Regions:
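Short glycine-centered segments of the SAM/dcSAM-binding site in methyltransferase folds
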Residues: 16
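Right-handed parallel beta-helix
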Residues: 20, 57, 61-66, 85-96, ...
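Extracellular beta-strand-rich solenoid/capping regions of secreted or surface-exposed proteins
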Residues: 2-5, 9-13, 26-59, 68-91, ...
Length: 291
């Protein structure tokens, strides 16, 4: 097949899509122009919109001996659609556009984000994912039984690997670097946020595993701005995330945060190397049961 998405459209539970050497880019790649706000929200390169099943994962991986590159300048590299489960992604290089951005461009984008958020005009909105695109992630929808392994993810403006509202996630043997430089969204390199148990399965077993990853040089260089903090943010500083906020408090190497208060699953961190990250190497925040 010519595109990875075509291969995904043909696969069934238990099947594998092999990807050979090459550079795979999103539509309109290379035609972004922040000075005119052109193509600032390009689509993902790869969308996994199917589920496997227990014992029959869908696998998206490199053909043996190959290292295909996913190159994006928009929303992200590989996204797993909401409520798609039993997925394995392995053996890719995923590269974002961070090397094409500088501090002045990112600060100007933060100013624009503030302008459209506070202009009291409902017809304007901020959607510049160019400055916050993720490498491999699950959108902001629920997932369970996902494996992300043996990938190289770098120069993503937002998180390199991220899952929200999920359970049974394994992130192992990835190399992650140069992420989060240019976003004003206070993101981190590898993130498990708002983890929640699969219905009927809220045990204290080890369910969320981050191991064997090399995570380095992931920083926030741009101050955080958001119109409203999440109710479960846990931050009581009235200036945090406002237009006038002058500090940078975020940018972790590995970050677990804001898990569901009733979530009983155990998080395992094992044999990760975290070096030269912005705030912390590993930060376990507003969650329970880590080992």
């Amino acid at each position: 097949f010519k595109t990875i998405n075509k291969g995904i459209s043909m696969v069934a539970a238990g099947g594998t899509v092999y990807v050979m050497d090459g550079i795979y880019q999103n539509e309109n790649y290379g035609n972004v122009d922040p000075s005119t706000n052109t193509n600032m929200n390009n689509q993902h390169v790869v969308t996994i919109n199917k589920s496997g099943s227990e014992g029959a994962y869908i696998t998206l991986r490199n053909y043996p001996g190959h290292l295909p590159k996913i190159q994006f300048d928009g929303r992200g590299g590989i996204v797993i659609s909401n409520n798609m489960n039993y997925i394995i992604v392995e053996g890719f290089e995923v590269e974002g556009p961070a090397q094409d951005i500088n501090y002045e461009m990112a600060e100007a984008d933060r100013d624009y984000k503030i302008e459209v958020a506070e202009d009291e005009d409902d017809s304007t909105n901020y959607n510049h994912s160019y400055f916050s695109g993720k490498g491999i992630w699950g959108g902001y929808g629920a997932h369970h039984n996902i494996i992300i392994r043996n990938n190289i993810v770098h120069d993503t403006c937002g998180s390199a690997i991220r899952f929200n509202d999920s359970d049974y996630i394994l992130i192992e043997n990835n190399i992650v670097y140069n992420s989060n430089w240019w976003t004003s969204s206070a993101s981190s390199a590898i993130v498990l946020a708002e983890s929640v148990a699969v219905s009927g399965d809220n045990t204290d077993d080890i369910k969320m595993i981050i191991r064997g990853n090399i995570v380095y040089n992931n920083w926030n260089r741009i101050r955080f701005y958001v119109t409203q903090l999440p109710d479960n943010s846990g931050n009581n500083n009235p200036n945090y995330g406002t237009a006038n906020f002058q500090s940078i408090w975020d940018g972790q190497g590995i970050y677990v945060t804001r898990s569901d208060p009733e979530y009983a699953g155990t998080f395992l961190f094992e044999n990760n190397l975290c070096l030269n990250n912005g705030k912390n190497g590993i930060n376990f925040d507003h969650s329970h049961s880590a080992s």
